[in-house]
């Protein structure tokens, strides 16, 4: 049992399969052929699970989700179209949900499309702030004002971005008060520029 607790969240098994493996499988089943995984201190553990199924992108210091994506900039600069970004620790994500977010992004021509959910106990999650019913920004739990803590719509950690616009914004991403770079800050920056963003509410 001691060995179990040493595993990172991504290497824990659910119904006999590691969390990260489940996420990668859902992404591939959704028709996404090329998958990259950002790894840090856990790189050996993740590589032993995923082997050569994915491309590995290395993050020397863990400075937040935005910083993780910055490590993928050289990889993204060779691509065009859209990129799907997911947290690695969401094992219940299905290929249908992934297809839904990608389809909406393309159909509505959104620069950013994010997955959100409504939960009765939102503590611990970033909250979705809407203006005129449109997603305006996502605020991490640590940066919430007291009045925002009652918001029940949360960020589910799945994003579809147009690559060119994402690259442009990533270059301007600032550190948060906690000294971290958040991918969620990209949403507000895009909205401030008047770019079209949207969401898919997971049932």
Where are each of the predicted segments found?
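Glycine-rich N-terminal loop/short-helix segment of MobA-like nucleotidyltransferase
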Residues: 1-14, 30, 49
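Short aromatic/basic micro-patch
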Residues: 13, 92, 160
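Conserved N-terminal catalytic core of the sugar/cofactor nucleotidyltransferase
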Residues: 17-88, 92-103
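Short, high-confidence coil segments that cap the C-terminus of an alpha-helix
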Residues: 32, 80, 107-112, 195
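A residue-level structural signature of the nucleotidyltransferase/glycosyltransferase Rossmann-like core
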Residues: 90, 127, 158-159
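Conserved donor-nucleotide/metal-binding helix-loop-beta segment in metal-dependent transferases, i.e.
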Residues: 96-123
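Rossmann-like NAD(P)H-binding beta-loop-alpha module
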Residues: 117-147
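Catalytic-core segments of class I nucleotidyltransferases/pyrophosphorylases
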Residues: 136-203
